[in-house]
Design a protein with these regions (language model features):
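Acidic donor-binding loop of glycosyltransferase active sites
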Residues: 75-77, 239-253, 262
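Conserved nucleotide-sugar phosphate-binding/catalytic loop shared by glycosyltransferases and other
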Residues: 6-61, 141-143, 204-206, 293-295
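Donor-nucleotide binding loops and adjacent catalytic segments primarily
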Residues: 23-27, 43, 162-247, 277-281, ...
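A short helix/loop element that forms part of the nucleotide-sugar donor recognition site in Leloir-type
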Residues: 150-162, 314
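A short, well-ordered alpha-helix in the C-terminal region of glycosyltransferases
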Residues: 314-328
């Protein structure tokens, strides 16, 4: 937004849990973001419970508050990624004739996004199959990700101590249920390092076990295994350097794998509405990844899948397929669309390319 509309004012509306406030307080653009709190309780899954009665009441009570807030802020446009805050804000924005852009990051939309999509001006989605859930007002933007511009693969590989003929396997589980992935890597490690250099992002809680697994390796193989808790500042370099990635299937992970063009073995997080399972299957169906269900992730299965991808020609075909799915400039596309909505100009998403 800073580049698409220099000098524009940005207001961030968050909830009462405090997470959003901390997010804004720690953001590099915090001096340009004004935080506002909307008192809305999270809505629960509908069912035969007290929440099936309370949720509609909570929603109805929150719409006037959202109406008042938008009347005070008078935004030119509203952007939301869904969630429990989105419904009252989108309803209030529609009533006030404020254009709204909703973004859905997963192949299978969440309940809130499905509901508010009917009231939004435009709905941006990360994956083409999601268009069917929002007929008439949706377009494919991709997922906003970090920039990979200017990263040289040879230089990135050199920074991790790789020789030209080495294969780099990068393993990471994000913040969700990484213990199962760590255990599979630890048991498979002696065989893995025979074929790959392994960069394993084990999380803070996994570092002790990763260190023990490294010490158990023969001296000649220890240099082929590197464990780190996280790799925030060098993650882009790691993905560019990688020959194969083992990871979860969140929207951002899938988008970054596609932007870089790296083949992957995806282990979808099995909870949170099973969104990651649908994301993974899209990449699998497009030939860019293989999938291991979370409950089938064992050292034996991990070894079988990595060994099947030792051959360069199969990995190269998967890399090409991933690259065809990449939308590395999604953030700018969303920003341009939002500015056009705010200014009443032609929408970039409707202009033929």
């Amino acid at each position: 937004m800073r580049d698409a509309r220099p000098g524009g004012e940005l207001d961030y509306i968050g909830g009462i849990r405090g997470f959003e406030r901390r997010l804004v307080a720690n953001h590099p653009m915090r001096g340009q973001l004004r935080y506002h709190e909307l008192v809305v309780r999270s809505l629960r899954s509908a069912g035969l419970s007290v929440h099936s009665v309370l949720d509609p009441a909570r929603l109805a009570a929150s719409v006037p508050q959202a109406w008042w807030m938008l009347g005070r802020l008078r935004p030119a446009a509203l952007f939301t990624t869904g969630g429990y805050l989105a419904m009252p804000l989108v309803l209030a924005a529609r009533a006030r004739s404020i254009p709204t852009l909703v973004w859905e990051g997963n192949v299978q939309p969440g309940r809130a996004t499905r509901a508010i999509g009917r009231f939004a001006t435009r709905v941006a989605v990360s994956f083409p199959p999601t268009l069917a859930a929002f007929p008439g007002n949706s377009f494919v933007s991709g997922t906003p990700i970090r920039s990979f511009d200017g990263i040289d693969r040879a230089a990135a590989r050199h920074s991790f101590g790789l020789d030209p003929g080495d294969r780099l396997l990068v393993v990471f589980g994000g913040s969700q249920a990484v213990a199962r992935m760590n255990a599979a890597v630890a048991r498979a490690l002696p065989q893995l390092v025979a074929d790959w250099h392994v960069l394993h992002l084990a999380g803070d809680d996994g570092m002790a076990d990763a260190g023990a697994a490294r010490q158990a390796l023969p001296d000649a193989l220890r240099l082929r295994y590197t464990a780190e808790p996280f790799l925030t500042d060098r993650m882009a370099d790691a993905l560019v350097a990688a020959d194969l990635v083992v990871g979860r299937a969140g929207s951002s992970t899938c988008a970054e794998l596609a932007a870089v063009g790296v083949p992957s073995i995806l282990v979808p997080y099995p909870y949170a509405g099973a969104h990651q399972r649908y994301n993974a299957r899209y990449l699998v169906n497009e030939g860019a990844a293989v999938e291991i269900p979370d409950d089938e992730l064992t050292s034996e299965r991990l070894l079988a899948e990595t060994e099947a991808l030792l051959h360069d020609h199969r990995r190269h075909a998967m890399a090409d397929a991933a690259r065809r799915l990449g939308r590395p400039h999604a953030a700018r596309m969303l920003a341009d669309e939002l500015v056009a909505l705010a200014e009443g100009g032609p929408l970039p998403s409707t202009v033929p390319s």
